[in-house]
Amino acid sequence: MTPTLDTKYVFTITARIGDVVTAGETGIGVRRIIPIIGGEVTGAVTGKVLPFGADFQTIRPNELIDLEAKYAFETADGAIVYVENKGIRFGPVELLQELKRGEPVDPKLIYFRTVPRFETGHEKYRWLMEHIFVASAARHADRVVIDVHQVM
C-alpha cells in the first residue's frame, strides 16, 4: 500500500491585482492577462508579494478558466521566492460573469484550485522546492486569496 495523502495548511498569499488586459479570442479561448501589483504572505511563511508578474488566463468556450500565474514574493527575512501557480476556476456561468465584472461572489460557489510551485536559492526555504503544494483560492475584485497546503 502507498502512503496516505494528507495536507497541512502552511500559508496564505494575498495577491493584489490590476486591471485586466484582454488579448481576445485566440482559437482556444479568450486570453486574459491580469497584472499582480503587490500583496502579502501570512502564516508559516511571511512577507510581501512583489509588484510584478501576472496571471495568464484562458477562458474556454464552456467558461472553464485555465490559470497560470507567475510572480514572486519576498519573505520577511529577505529571501526571494519565485512562484508558478497553475490551476482552474469553474462554476455557474452567471457567477463567473459576475466575477469578470468585478462583482462580489461567494467563493464557496466557485471551484478555484491550483498547484503552486516555488523556487528559491535561500536555504531556509528550500523545503518549498522539496514538497508538493495544492491551494484553494478565492477571486475578489482587487485581489486573489490563495490558501496553500503542503501535501504530506
From Swiss-Prot:
InterPro entries with a match to the protein in the record: UPF0311 (IPR020915)
Give the matching Pfam families.
DUF3237
Return the Gene3D superfamilies for the record.
2.40.160.20
Q: Which residues form the signal peptide?
A: none
PANTHER family found in the cross-reference section: UPF0311 PROTEIN BLR7842 (PTHR37315:SF1)
What HAMAP family would the database entry show? Answer: UPF0311 (MF_00775)
What family name appears in the similarity comment? Answer: Belongs to the UPF0311 family.
Protein name (record): UPF0311 protein blr7842
Q: What is the lineage of its organism?
A: Bacteria, Pseudomonadati, Pseudomonadota, Alphaproteobacteria, Hyphomicrobiales
